[in-house]
C-alpha cells in the first residue's frame, strides 16, 4: 500500500500541535521536579495522593513526553501520554473538579500525530473515503 506523505502544511501543523504536550510534559515536569517540589507535593496531597508519590509521578511524566517527541517512538509516546492523562482525568473527576484540560491535551497528542503521520489516517478517519 503506497502512502502519500502529508502535505508540508499538515506536517508542520502536526509538529506545532505535538510540541504543546511535549513542552508541558517535559519542561513543565522538569521545572516542577527541581524548582517547585513543595507546590507539587501540596497538590498531590490535595488530591489524596501521598506526598511521596510526587517525584515518581513527575519522573514518569518526563519520559512520556520525550518518547512522544521522537518520531520513531511517537506512537508509544502517544499511548503512554494517553494513559498518563487518563489518570489525570480520573483524579480530577474524583476531586469533583473540571477535567477538560487533560482531555484537550489528549486530543492534541493524537491530532498532532495524525497530522504528521499518514499511517494514522485510516485508523482515525475524519471523513469517509
Pin down the residues of each PLM region.
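Core segments of alpha-helical transmembrane spans in multipass integral membrane proteins
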Residues: 49-69, 76
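Solvent-exposed, well-ordered loop and adjacent helix/strand elements within mature globular domains
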Residues: 26-53
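A generic alpha-helix surface/boundary motif
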Residues: 37-38, 60-62, 84
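Extended, low-polarity transmembrane helix blocks
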Residues: 1-28, 70-129
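Hydrophobic alpha-helical transmembrane segments
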Residues: 1-7, 46-56
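Short hydrophobic/aromatic segments of transmembrane alpha-helices and their interfaces
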Residues: 23, 48, 57-59, 102-103
